[in-house]
């Protein structure tokens, strides 16, 4: 039964990726960016139902354009990278030409970064800042790679520094999966694709995947290092299973 479920979900997900890749550029051309974003949000909802992702949100999405900074426990996080307004998503260049996934990511205007290249990381900074100043949001993972889902990995300070210098607001997003199987880590060296496919198949066999998203209140940073520490503490706090759920603004008030 679980194998049949996985086959159906994989087929439906590939079809949805193809629909997004083919339809979104045309919708954006004819109807404009806002209509394209509404289509994208509908697509996200369809993907959640297809994968049976049960998403719990704690706190609110920001009312103003913001840089959303999230921890990165799984590749499933790509289905959680959205805001109520058009959003620029930063992703690893390695996935740009992946069948279905890469095609769809190119259609939504993903900003690609070579994670091991400092110059590439520097080049994406103005793209993110310009997006926010153009009344869009941006979503990225300052860890730069997926982790084991237990604690955040090493966080790079670059985007915190850029946000502080530009005076644009940032919102922290804590991502916690109820099923430990969702977390995924690989060094992207030998054997990555077979390892990824085996892990994906095991997730597709799961009856349901629960995920909890916790949003902080938007804040303008004055000290990049302090903002980075706040992000790390916010994520660690959310990942603790023994902490009762409470409003996101209870963590940081300034």
Provide a role label for each language-model segment.
Residues 111-132, 137:
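A membrane-cytosol interface segment of integral membrane proteins
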Residues 1-56, 103-107, 206:
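A transmembrane-helix-recognition feature enriched in membrane-embedded lipid enzymes
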Residues 20-31, 64-118:
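Catalytic core of membrane glycerolipid acyltransferases/transacylases, capturing the structured
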Residues 54-55, 89, 112, 138, ...:
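Hydrophobic beta-strand scaffold residues
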Residues 112-115, 216-221, 234-237:
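Polar-ligand-bearing catalytic/cofactor-coordination segments
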């Amino acid at each position: 039964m679980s194998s049949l479920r996985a086959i159906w979900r994989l087929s439906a997900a590939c079809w949805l990726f193809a629909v997004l890749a083919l339809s979104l550029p045309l919708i954006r051309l004819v109807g404009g960016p806002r209509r394209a974003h509404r289509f994208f949000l509908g697509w996200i909802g369809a993907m959640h139902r297809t994968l049976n992702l049960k998403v719990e949100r704690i706190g609110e999405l920001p009312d103003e354009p913001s840089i959303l900074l999230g921890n990165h426990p799984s590749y499933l996080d790509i289905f959680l990278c959205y805001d109520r307004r058009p959003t620029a998503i930063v992703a690893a260049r390695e996935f740009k030409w992946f069948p279905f996934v890469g095609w769809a990511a190119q259609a939504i205007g993903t900003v690609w970064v070579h994670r091991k290249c400092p110059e590439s990381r520097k080049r994406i900074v103005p793209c993110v800042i310009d997006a926010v100043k153009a009344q869009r949001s941006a979503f990225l993972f300052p860890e730069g790679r997926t982790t084991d889902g237990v604690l955040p990995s090493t966080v790079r300070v670059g985007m915190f520094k850029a946000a502080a210098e530009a005076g644009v607001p940032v919102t922290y997003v804590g991502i916690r999966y109820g099923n430990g199987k969702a977390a995924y880590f690989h060094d992207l060296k030998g054997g990555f694709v077979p390892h990824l496919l085996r892990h994906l198949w095991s997730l597709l066999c799961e009856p349901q995947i629960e995920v909890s998203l916790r949003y902080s209140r938007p804040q303008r940073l004055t000290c990049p290092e302090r903002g980075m520490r706040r992000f790390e503490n916010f994520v660690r706090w959310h990942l603790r299973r023994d902490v009762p759920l409470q409003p996101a603004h209870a963590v940081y008030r300034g």
